[in-house]
Amino acid sequence: MFPPIGLATLPKALIRIHGPDATKFVNGLVTTRLLPDIVKKKQHTISENENSHQELSQIIDVHRNWGLMHEDIYDPSNTIYVSRGGINSMFLNSKGRVFTDCFIYAHPFANSSENDHPDYVVEVDESLRTKLQMLLKLHKLAAKVNIEKLENVESHYYYNDTPEFDSFLEELQNNYILTKDPSQAREMAQRLIDDQAIFGPNIPVVGFAVDNRIPNFGIKFLTKQLQNQDPFSSSFKSQFESPSVSAQDVAVRRYTNGLLEQADVSSDVSILPFETNLDFTNGLSLDKGCYVGQELTIRTFNGGTIRKRVVPVQFFELKNVESMAAKHEPEYNLKDAVVDHLSKITQTDLKSLVISRMDGSDATEEHQTSSPFGSSKPVRKRKSGSGKILARHGNVGLALMNLGEIEHQSMFKVTIGDEDDTEIGLKSFVPGWWPQ
């Protein structure tokens, strides 16, 4: 098992985007909303809630360092907060496919001035930094923004899977993060630092976010290099432990909870934002108008044609079918015998493994004729795998599964494709944090 509590430094790249046009520039490239006004160009691009936040344009000056909007498309009250806390988001390509996931931070978190220009830090995996910088410069054109790598800043992640920490985060957000206007956001961000609710004195905090991709999943924070200095205050440490863990431990925890990041998959994998559960992880706005890749995304949401989603999976030897069938959540075990079989498969080759039903039957899809007059030939069935493996570590992983399949069964088998065509089992799990 991975540690239930941990603090890690993550291999992330940080790109700073600042200048008079920074809010408009970033808004046009990501799936979350930064502009208070909605520019309506096509009827299907704006949801019916389009007029419910008209006051935002009165309290937000997009040419100043105002912060970020926090919203949840599944919140029935449709509340939007204005905060200095960071948010989860995505960059898409022009075809609506995922370019990269990211976190966006208001910069700096505290000690900001209302007279400063908009200033953001975008956090992505280090392996995707060069590609993202090229994308940003491609779209810059005449925009009055500066794009630069943020040097000598570290990305940290802390998680704690106890009810006490969950309650702590609820109170923390209510007291410091869920603010309604830029002035209050600046005041509460500074108070969080001054109160030492989390961070010790003189810790150079650059950015902060509660990771709500899954409710209260952890906290993310950016600091100038700490040189092994403990970031937490005495008050925080009196309540919670903070043992050091690896970035790999953080990734395995994501896997077992069904949370994909683009760096987890090989570069030739093409995936849609809804397939990564972006709508479930507070990374999508339906009320922001146009952005790169937006049209397909909103049409998919409104059309309700989401057939596949990423879910956590556990691999097992087929002799353990009965014990696996009784499990309700994946259990990470690097010493599981099935790991020896999986070690023969490279990350790039994972997606080519065929997931099939345990009973040996094939998933099928109707093959519809394109003729308006139908066809005299019998309707054919097109064979389709039950899903695609995207990432793995040890005996757990992430797979893109057909929702129609996993609604009826969770046990599948996979042929490794070695000399003996070894077959292993795969169990899919529907995360408990998915909206009902």
Curated annotation (Swiss-Prot):
One of its GO terms (cellular component) is mitochondrial matrix. SUPFAM superfamilies: Folate-binding domain (SSF103025). It is found in: Mitochondrion matrix. Residues 359-387 are annotated as: Disordered. The gene is CAF17. GO terms for molecular function: transferase activity. GO terms for biological process: iron-sulfur cluster assembly. Belongs to the GcvT family. CAF17/IBA57 subfamily. Pfam families: Beta-barrel_CAF17_C (PF25455). This is Iron-sulfur cluster assembly factor IBA57 homolog, mitochondrial. Residues 1-42 form a transit peptide. Keywords: Mitochondrion, Transit peptide.
